[in-house]
Amino acid sequence: MSIRVAIAGVGNCASSLVQGVEYYKDTKDEDKIPGLMHDNFGGYRVRDIEFVTAFDVDALKVGKDLSEAIGASQNNTIKFADVPNLGVEVLRGPTNDGLGEYYRQMIEESDAEPVDVAQVLRDKKVDVLVSYLPVGSEKADKAYAQAAMDAGCAFVNCLPVFIASDPEWAQKFRDAGVPIVGDDIKSQVGATITHRVLARLFEDRGVRLDRTYQLNVGGNMDFMNMLQRSRLESKKISKTRAVTSVVPHEMDPHNVHIGPSDYVAWLDDRKFAFVRLEGTTFGDVPLNLEYKLEVWDSPNSAGIVIDAVRAAKIALDRHLAGPVLAPSSYFMKSPAVQHEDGEARRLVEEFIKGEVEGTEEQLDADVAAAKAAGKDVWRA
């Protein structure tokens, strides 16, 4: 029982995902694996993930075996597993808006003819397509989403292009009878999840959150790409929503700054996050909190993607269509409906057991409940 997976964008995140599947291929059901909810996730284990095709536009990756491409060109994440030859050639995908100006300074675009993505997905009998395209790839990501619908495979949208959380696109997936888990992958323990937890802690302990910022620096191609500020709009919206949605009162946008800040080449795939929260406590006395988080960026989300892929396959098996609500809320920054993280995890556990499904009726109920609780809700 395998999950046939395709990858769009063979960068650092794809490298960590492929390495992770190799690294944990011999685990047992009772093993506690860092970064995964369960080794056995609804009947699917890590070793059940099988990479069958991949797409990229980098001349140094196209035509290579996936095992080689994950270490090629500008990829600079940490190596933690030796990946054998997979017999999976990286194919030339369509570019669209996938290459920003800084990307074009660093890589050579392949001169090979782009393939018909939907046809490849059909030919390879792909179950789940994972999109790892660069931030700002609006047209390119939506083209891959359309290809997934055309081919009848599930889609995991790891970047901040609003598809699962966009009403029009969510309906397209429902009409096509195809599930989507999205949008914008969370890390295992990253800047967004820690910021969310502490913002919620302030409110739970009666501290009014007045102002906050989150500044991120890193040395991978993602951070270089985001130097082009025109590609950042959806990223900033996604990260900001993820934090402010757990705060019950409206925050003045002037008092919230969350987003990537700069590129520091020598950090490689490490990310440093600097976060500050300013609040008001008893007696209108100020209370301030600052912290710094250091992570290897790509491995920090790879386990989450493994769980998201398995959730997408379960949804496919159950013939669900449109946004898969519980997994999207737990694994993604910008889902159709936000839940507090503990509640989202509980819903995923119920989803695994088949007690919660991604139905339109459930979506309506979740939205109504969230609005009644005063949450910032956006609905697909």
Give residue ranges: language-model regions.
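Gly/Ser/Thr-rich loops at beta-strand to alpha-helix junctions
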Residues: 9-15, 133-139, 159-165, 186-192, ...
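Rossmann-fold dehydrogenase core element
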Residues: 172-185, 206, 210
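N-terminal glycine-/serine-/threonine-rich beta1-alpha1-beta2 phosphate-ribose binding loop
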Residues: 1-144, 150, 229-237, 273
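Short acidic, glycine/serine/threonine-rich loops at helix termini
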Residues: 18-20, 64-67, 167-170, 194-195, ...
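C-terminal active-site/capping subdomain that shapes the small-molecule cofactor and substrate pocket
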Residues: 38, 273-380
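Short catalytic-loop micro-motif centered on adjacent basic/acidic residues
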Residues: 129-131, 155-158, 181-184, 212
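Rossmann-fold NAD(P)-binding glycine/threonine-rich loop
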Residues: 134-150, 158-179
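Active-site-lining helix/loop region of Rossmann-like oxidoreductase modules
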Residues: 8, 47, 61, 72, ...
